[in-house]
């Protein structure tokens, strides 16, 4: 091989070496950038993991509070139902309804009925239910 061929081969090899060196530098920069991104992502993963732990703890607290509230509500509902079932309706002499007819009115109703007046008309005149007049005439009341 001649000197000029060797010089040409040397120039070509030097050019390839410089190209490979530039490519190597570019890849090294990319590698550093990717390492930086990986480090950032790992840090973000830790932040997300910590937030997830806090969120799950808060969720467990809320669920426990909800269970306590449900138990309390169920107990109150049962107590209210029992109290409501134990209420006795008012009966007897302390009952708030007053007697609708006096003794005198009862006598008048019986006489008017025997005189031929209708029970419906008597009920309207005295402001009572026709059933009350019927019971009065039959002697169930008074």
From Swiss-Prot:
The record's region (Disordered) falls at 82-101
Q: What is this protein called?
A: Gene 46 protein
Cite the source lineage.
Viruses, Duplodnaviria, Heunggongvirae, Uroviricota, Caudoviricetes
